[in-house]
Every structure is written in structure tokens, then in C-alpha cells.
Amino acid sequence: MSDAATRAEETSEGHSSSAIGLMVGAVGVCYGDIGTSPLYTLKEVFIGGYGVQANHDGVLGVLSLIFWSLVWVVSIKYVIFVLRADNQGEGGVMALSALARRAAAPFGRLQTFVVVAGLIGAALFYGDSMITPAISVLSAVEGLEIAFDGLEHWTVPLALIVLIGLFLIQKHGTARIGILFGPVMVLWFGALAALGVYGVIQQPEVLQAMNPVWAVRFFSSHPGIGVAILGATVLALTGAEALYADMGHFGRKPIARAWFLLVLPALVLNYFGQGATILSNAEAARNPFYLLAPGWALLPMVALSTLATVIASQAVISGAFSLTRQAIQLGYVPRMTIQHTSSHEQGQIYIGGVNWALMVGVVLLVLGFESSASLAAAYGVAVTGTMLITTLLMGVVIWRLWKWPLWLGVPFFCVMLAVDSLFFAANLPKVIQGGAFPVIAGIVIFILMSTWKRGRQLLVERLDEGSLPLSVFISSMRVQPPHRVQGTAVFLTARTDAVPHALLHNLLHNQVLHEQVVLLTVVNEDSPRVSPDRRFEVEAYGDGFFRVILHFGFMEEPDIPAALRLCHLNELDFSPMRTTYFLSRETVIPSKRIGMARWREGLFAFLLKNANGNLRYFNLPLNRVIELGTQVEI
């Protein structure tokens, strides 16, 4: 986990106030999505066209399905097991993919599968990042329709105002108001629990739903729609992936404690309270969440619901920023400008391109679907797809990293896979009912990410063709030494055994070399952070030539000047006014050579042209950089 989270969790072992503070923070960041699911889950089950009757058996059967889904998928799978699969404390589909890829290193095909699975999981997460704000805020604002007649036409405009405002403030950061997220969400879960108790007291028989017999009986008595209902009940699990993705901020224990001590009891009570309301009045199925509340509490609950959904949306947006930074470092996404919005919290970042793309997607979803009930069909595919990818990657971790015995690992993995596959299969019919959006968004994002990754590989391969071996070049410099000028020249190169093109071009045109020539390679590791003692490798070739390899984790910012200043070697001088950085700027030309389809080559050329260059990405000083261009056919 991050250094701050590690220190905080260690401190929490001896100080209850620190432990409570971490739990409250985890509630505000990790549980917003799953915490707002009661707004729309039961409503979708009973009015979503599945044919479930709002009678005694139907209500108890659905409640039992939701209860045991929360217990198995969230409590057992995610909280108890998946949270243990941390990549040096970091979680999320990208971190898990990097961990599984490292574990699968001896198996080429398995490693390829892990990479593809990780890309699909990340692509689905971006689709989920668009749907969550739209359905959550719409669900909250729809409470006004219960409080006041004739406000149906105002639901979409009000939701758009809230959502657009949320995206507009992202550039300025949420550090100041972020401190309120935890307390507000604690209040939200307290309200969920209180409303649930209020409903359960009126119909205590709903507590029978904790008996799994009701879920089994529901399936047996509804053979035609039993599996389809899973496509709706899975809405109660939305946000389970966020627990894992945000682990680096708080650590495993605070997230787990918050779940078992507050979030799970509040969710179960509220779902059971809604079920009690439906048992008392079948008409309440049209919006059981708001109809559970007493009349005097309706408007306060609309206001609190809106706050909770905004916080949930903020957490998802921040998660998209964080995932993008990881993907950039791991080489799956073109480099983008990353702006820090807080001087105290390293994780508070803003990526403009991602923010505006999400905003456009969210606005189109709200305008296209117009209600949370319509959006619910699109939601399940992204959620269950991501859960299935996590299970597949966990299988690799259990086998290769944890080395569980087969008698334990195989049955556990098979049960996880069967449950997630059942949920995913139940949601596949939704693709033709509105669920195509996350699938299309996922396909587009997967194509972009895989094209960028493959294009970068082809680019390096083409640059390597005809490259001059470093040993040959240094030997030739000794035979015919060029004129040397004062200072240090740093040439960035992806290869550690070949001469950079920028060095050859500089020597060809300027006929000079610096006193010190550093061939620099930056390696992005599969781990989130690299310890200072592993940051750099230095090798001296003699005659003023040096090879330096810098290592960065996928959660770190590659600041080359700062890292080079840590290279403690007497012969090297990296003082700012004596160091010049030479970069190559490649222009890709699509060709008929074997590599990628022509349209993908054109797409890669476009992405490369619009990506941030090495200058910004590596934090190089503007007045000490020389860029040399070259054209490359791929």
C-alpha cells in the first residue's frame, strides 16, 4: 500500500482514534458506489419486467438472493480474499494484472492471457465509470417525483446540472471538501440502517430471508426467470471492485472493518426494510427506497441521497484518473498531462482528457436513457464483466503466487468462477436491452489500449533494425575520437545494448560529443513503487561513456532530473546547467509491412502524434532539451 496508508495502518494498531479515522475515510471513498445501490436495486427487480410478483414468496426470495450475494461476493470473495492479493499494497484490476503477469512469467501464453484480461477489465471499468454517476444521481433526484407531483420532467435537467457541475470542479480538486466525504457517508449508512429498522419492525418476517432456503425455493419456483433475476440482483454488488481499487489509500484492515461493522449491516437492514414496505403495500415496488421513508423524512433523504451519489460519483471519477495513471506507466495508454490538485496528497490528480471524455459519456447516458430504471439494464454487464476478470486473474495468483494446494485452490476458484459466470451470463441478454453501451465503450477502449501497446512494441522493433551495437560504436570512437565539449549529454533510449538514434544524428550533424555521454533507459516496473536502493543502475564504459538504467513503479512519477541527482558516481556531473537532454521524436508512417492492420497503424500514428512527449512526461527542463526527429515505417 502507499507509504501513508502503511504508516496509518501501523499506527491504528495501537491507537483506536487512528483506526476509526481510517475506517471513516474508507467509508467515504470505497463504499459510495455500493452504498447507493439501495436506491435502485429492488425497484429494478420488481418493475424491470422480470415477472417477479411483489408477494410474500417473491419478496423473501429476492431478499435472500441479495443477502447471500453480498455475503459471498463482497464479504468472502473481495473483503476476505481479493484484498489479500495486493501489489505492494496497491489494488485494482491494473495492479492485479501486473501482479498476475509477474506470477505467470514462466508461461508465455498464460502471461499473454493475463495481459489481455487486464486490458478487458480496465476497459470495462471505464464503461462503469460513466454509468455509475449517471444512474446514481438520477436515482437520487427521482425522489423528488415521490415528494412532489408533476416534477417528472425536471429529473433529467436537475441530474445534468449536478453531474456537469461535478465534472467542472475536478480541475480544482476536491481536497478541501474531501474531508467531509467520510462523515457524510457514515451519516448516509446510519440513515440506511435507521430506515431499514423502521421497515423491519413493521414486517419482521422479512428476516426469514437470511435463510438460504428462500433463495433456493425462489429458483425452483421460478425456473424461467430465476437466472434472469440475478441480472437485477447483481446491482446490489456494484462498487465491490472499488474496495479493492482503493486499497492503497487505506489498507486492507480499515476497509474490511468498515464493511463488517457498518456498511454490510446498514445495507442488509435497508434492503430488508424495503422488502417489508413492499410486503405492506405492493404498489411501493415502484420506488421502495423513498416510500420506505416517513413523509417528514422524504425531502431530507432526497438531499442526503444526492450528496451520497455525488460522493460515489467522485470516487469513481478519481478511480478512473488513478487507473489511467497506472495504465500510462505500464505502457497501455498514451502519455497525458497529469495535474496534481493537492500539495499534500499525492493521489489527488486530474487528467483533463479522461475527465471530459467521462463527462460526455455521462451526459449522453442521461439524455439517452432518461431514468435509472432504463440505465439499470446497461449497468450489470460492466459490473459482472469486471468481477469475472478479477476472478480469472485471482486464479493465477492463487496458483502461481500463493501456491495453494490443488485440493483447496481448485474448488475455491471453481466456485468463484461459477458464481461470477452465472451473474455474467444473466446479464448478457441485457446487451440488446440497452446494455450494449458498456460493451461498445469497452471494445473501443480495449482497441485503443491494445493498439497503443502493440504499436509501441513495433516502433521499438523497427528502431532496432539496423541499430549500431554499443560496443562497436565505442570502439570506433577510440579509433577516431571526435571533438569533445564540456558538459553531460543524456540520450534516452529503450535499448540497453544499442546506440540511440539521437546520438548518431547529433554526431553526424554537429561532429562533437560531450565530455560525459550518458545512455539512459527508463524501466517501468510491475510493482507500484521502487525502493531507493533499486532506483538506478550505473555502468561505466570508459572514455566518458556511461549506461544508466532508472527504475520506476507504476504509481510513481518518472522525474528523471531528480533521479539522476541520486546517482552517486564521482565521474558523473548532472548539475542542471551542465546537463543537456537529447530526445528522439518519432513520426510513424503506416506501411504494408507485417505488423498491424493498416487502420490500426493509422490509429497508432494518430495516438503517438497527440501523446505527451518525453519532455513533459519525464519532467525535463525546457531550456536543456534538444529533440531530433525521425520517421519510422511500421
UniProtKB/Swiss-Prot annotation:
GO terms for molecular function: potassium ion transmembrane transporter activity; symporter activity. It is found in: Cell inner membrane. It is a multi-pass membrane protein. Keywords: Cell inner membrane, Cell membrane, Ion transport, Membrane, Potassium, Potassium transport, Symport, Transmembrane, Transmembrane helix, Transport. InterPro entries: K+_transporter, K_trans_C, K_trans_N, Kup. It catalyses: K(+)(in) + H(+)(in) = K(+)(out) + H(+)(out). Its main location: membrane. One of its GO terms (biological process) is potassium ion transport. It comes from the Bacteria. GO terms for cellular component: membrane; plasma membrane. The chain crosses the membrane at residues 19-39, 62-82, 113-133, 150-170, 177-197, 225-245, 259-279, 291-311, 349-369, 379-399, 406-426, 431-451. Belongs to the HAK/KUP transporter (TC 2.A.72) family. Transport of potassium into the cell. Likely operates as a K(+):H(+) symporter. This is Probable potassium transport system protein Kup. It comes from Pseudomonas aeruginosa (strain ATCC 15692 / DSM 22644 / CIP 104116 / JCM 14847 / LMG 12228 / 1C / PRS 101 / PAO1). The lineage of its organism: Bacteria, Pseudomonadati, Pseudomonadota, Gammaproteobacteria, Pseudomonadales. The gene is kup.
